Amino acid sequence: LQTLIDRGYMIETLEEFEIGYSKVKDRVVIPVRDTQYKIVGLIGRAIHEWQEPRYLYNKGFKRADVLFNIQNAKRYDSVVICEGSLDAMKVSQAGYKNVVATLGAKVSANQVKMIRKFFDSVVIFSDNDDAGAEMRSAIIDECRGKELFTVAIPDGLKDPGDMTQEQIVHAIENKKTFIGDYT
């Protein structure tokens, strides 16, 4: 877990999200829960640059059926949506407990249903790349009628996981209201 601590994750955050370590796979293990707090999947995240693939999932785990941290975020009217679980953990660490992750750049119909069911306001904090732009557009298209905001990641950084707590707070406080067609 030292790798995550070195990347700015606090011990308290790792404990809050019940992060573990697999000696057998030499990976960080991240549990994923459903709205009823039941563990529905495990993510094995590579900790070394040479490890491929970067993510391993337990057999039968369907990422498209869940939003990471939905069990906690569902208590709020507003949600911050990130792509990765580590991004969501970093945003939560910055004080935004109403954060979820889609566990990939694709947003599924089931994920959209959950977003529409639980939240009135949606803050899109997608990665700073082409896939992140596609994710942002998909959420905007599927969540019309909700209050929609977008967050900009500073140039030179890829995702919220690369940001400091101060940068995350500043980015979310300066979110842009989405109005009309997104280009």
Question: Where do the model's predicted regions map?
Answer:
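Phosphate-handling DNA/RNA-contact segment within nucleic-acid enzymes
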Residues: 2-119, 135-136
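A short glycine-rich beta-strand->turn/loop micro-motif centered on a GG-aromatic cluster
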Residues: 99-105, 149-158
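Acidic beta-strand-to-loop metal/phosphate-binding motif
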Residues: 81, 119-131, 152
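Conserved phosphate-handling catalytic cores of large alpha/beta enzymes
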Residues: 128, 135-144, 148, 152
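C-terminal or mid-to-C-terminal helical accessory/interaction module adjacent to the motor/catalytic core
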Residues: 150-157, 163-183
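Alpha-helical scaffold elements adjacent to nucleotide-binding pockets in ATP/GTP-utilizing enzyme cores
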Residues: 114, 138-142, 167
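Acidic, metal-coordinating catalytic cores used for nucleic-acid/nucleotide bond scission
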Residues: 106-108, 126-137, 157
